[in-house]
Amino acid sequence: MNLSPREKDKLLVSMAAMVARRRLERGVKLNHPEAIALISDFIVEGARDGRSVAELMQAGAEVLTRAQCMDGIAEMIHDIQVEATFPDGTKLVTVHQPIR
């Protein structure tokens, strides 16, 4: 199976998001990379499901709470930008203050 660098990146983010979900289920607080991966995966999958950019920008900020992350993680992440494939093409989705 030959994957492009972009496909490899998407696969890595997806795998990291799976790990993050399992940790949340066990009650483990997420670190910086896990939080980024979980929110990014939510956006990519939402785009594939046909949700709009505006919808994902709003919903992306509701994926995680401060209580689900290690101390200081919410302050470290100001914005998350994800290039996602929508039914009408690839678009950049920006989520401001994603962990509230």
UniProtKB/Swiss-Prot annotation:
GO terms for cellular component: cytoplasm. Keywords: Cytoplasm, Hydrolase. InterPro entries: Urease_gamma, Urease_gamma/gamma-beta_su, Urease_gamma_sf, Urease_subunit. CDD domains: Urease_gamma. It catalyses: urea + 2 H2O + H(+) = hydrogencarbonate + 2 NH4(+). GO terms for molecular function: nickel cation binding; urease activity. One of its GO terms (biological process) is urea catabolic process. Pathway: Nitrogen metabolism; urea degradation; CO(2) and NH(3) from urea (urease route): step 1/1. Its EC number is 3.5.1.5. It is found in: Cytoplasm. Belongs to the urease gamma subunit family. Heterotrimer of UreA (gamma), UreB (beta) and UreC (alpha) subunits. Three heterotrimers associate to form the active enzyme. This is Urease subunit gamma. It comes from Rhodopseudomonas palustris (strain BisA53). The gene is ureA.
